Amino acid sequence: MADSVTIGQLEKLSVQCDKENQHVENKENNINSDNINLLEATKTTLPIPNTSNTNPPMNQSSSPTTTTTTPTTTTTPTTAEPAKKRKIFAKLHLLNRDGSVKNYFEMKKTKLIIGSDTELADIQVVRPGIYPKHVEIIYDKEKKKFYLNPLIDPKDSDNVRLNFVPFLHKKEVLGNGDIISIGFRSIKMEFIEKVTVDQLVQPEKQYIPSNTPTCITNTPIQTPPTTSPPSSTTTNKKDNTSTNVTKKPIATVPSTTTSTKKSSVVPESKPATKTITKETPKPTKTTTTTTVTTSKPTVKPTAVKKSINDDDYGDDYNEEEDDDDEEEEEEEEEEEEEEEVESKQIKVVNSKPNDDDMSCKKPMKYTNTNEEMRKSLASNVGGINSKIISKGDSVRNLLPISSRRPTAPVTPTKPTSTKKVTTPKKATVVKPPKESKVPKVPKVPKVPKAAVVASIDENGKEDYIRLISFKKAKDIVKAFQSHEKLVKSKNNGHGNISNEKKEILKCFEVLDQINWRLSTDKPGDSRPISSYFKNIPSLSEFDSELLTDYYSMISEPMSINSILSSVIYTADYNIDNCLDDFNQVLENSMTYNSENSIIYWLAHYCKIELYKALSNSGIIQNKLYLDIKKDSETFLKSIGTQLKGDGISLPQIIAQSVSKNKEQTVPQEEDEEEEEEEEEEEEEEEEGEEGKEDEEEEEKEEEEGEENEEEEDVEIDDCEIDQESDDDQ
């Protein structure tokens, strides 16, 4: 009975536990209904009651109820994960003008875009000429390198500079501390992520030693003969008789000489040109003799070795041409030092003739110095070559590019020898003046200025001109030529237009009837004043470079044929539109050409003639024509003075030719008479100009004759003064 009672009590307790657990689950489901993951977590953490666990006693049955509720309170905070910190690859420091750091930006992704757009770009730079996506900085995780990639056209890449180097047209590798300039805004890179650096291997420099010992060989080598001043000493033989023995000047012996018994004493490591002097007893007397020395002949070697630093010279450039003067000066200084040493030794010997020690030591010392000089020259068979190479390897100031002589033939000079007599005074040798070998640079003809990258407008701001491509320039020409051809193809369809437009067309035809030519042209060579403005520039007149420059500078091209086609085929095209387009034609020509040009002059002259024709036809008021004429004539005068100053002749306006329209009829006889009169007037003007030139030449000749007479008078006076001084002496 006791067992059944306990079993019943345990069943009641289990039912209560199940109810409590269900109540807790309902509360948690209501609280966390929005989060499905938390619901599943709470369900898994709550234990399901086991019916098999009915045997434990009463004190142990209450413990599962407390343990099951505790996990539910601890599961909720564990599901919220903390936000991960993003990796920083580099820092971009924004610099001020003085180089100080203004602010910095952390690069937290592998690609960073810099531009003017606030949405597309990570860093905004609002400056003129900056595109929405201007440049990007990339970090390659595989190669572990940072790259700078410009996203704009290479022609506009002057806005992007790496370490102040402009015109970046491809992806460049960045280094730690590099400065990126975008629209004159400097950004300094600081790497935080590890970067691999490519180790640059410099090429090995092969230096040639200037003085290397040479062994005796049987190969003939051409060496310039070098002479040394002979030393004269008197030696005593066994019979104590004094004889004068003069040593001949020693010359460098070619290495083709065969070794004899006497020369077998010379060791192999020393050059063959060394001479051995026999030991002589102490002399009792010394005599001095004046010796004549010959300077070393300057012989240019056949093959000159170039220095490593001479990469910028041409193939035909010779180092010896630049160092001839220095070599001659050094040789003269060496000779003068030798002469001073000789004079000092002679004075010492003459002052103490009976001193045996001094008489022995001084000549021996003199011979030793000569032998040392011969050793230094003979140590390298090409002594002169080694001297030139040693100078070539030294640091020197290079000639400017304009003064270098490209492809100048090297002409070897003949060896010259100058004799000098040893005297206590220094002998001065007068050198003939050298002719300047620098060729005259021809003057470069003036070329019209190309498109500028930036210009300053009236307000002082920079106005950037963007260069267009050659393809775009050709498209502009093609579009305008199709519009210009309408005038030629449908020129007979003028009947449908208004009378005002017909008068406008007649006024433009006046520009075709007025011709001009230069004084240097032939009498029959003339062209209309509107020839330069008839069509827009095309490939028939310009090359590809000038064509792109023209249409980069001229944003609104216009021509007279385009105006005529608009007059004929555009209904609402009136006189105001026509004058605006005509002024645009002249403005384009004056923008591209300089002020002191013939086209600039013709533009103002065409303007006067067109407004004059429009005023005569009554389309515009006469006051407007007079104002335009006054302004344009002042321009014509100033341009004319500039052209005369530059030596350019002004265009000569020829009378109007016969009109091509059938409505206007001009008799041919009158035209011929007018042409003859004009030709006669032109001939008279040319004769008058020639007469003026002849008079100017005669005046110049007379002035030169007077100057020559004055010079002769001065020479005669000088001769008389010299004669008087001679008579006085």
From Swiss-Prot:
Q: Give yes or no: UniProt keyword Coiled coil.
A: yes
Xref: Gene3D superfamilies = 2.60.200.20, Bromodomain-like (1.20.920.10)
- Which keywords does this chain's UniProt record carry? Bromodomain, Coiled coil
Bias kind Acidic residues: ranges:
310-341, 668-729
The residue ranges flagged as biased composition, category Low complexity, are 46-79, 208-221, 229-275, 283-306, 406-431
Q: Which InterPro entries match?
A: Bromodomain, Bromodomain-like_sf, SMAD_FHA_dom_sf
According to the entry, every stretch annotated as the Bromo domain falls at: 498-617
For whether the record's keyword set contains Coiled coil, the answer is yes
Q: Which residues form a coiled coil?
A: 315-352, 659-718
* Region Disordered, annotated ranges: 46-83, 208-361, 403-442, 659-729
| Record domain FHA: where | 112-167
Q: Which SMART domains match?
A: BROMO
* UniProt-recorded name of the protein: Bromo and FHA domain-containing protein DDB_G0267958
Q: Which organism is it from?
A: Dictyostelium discoideum
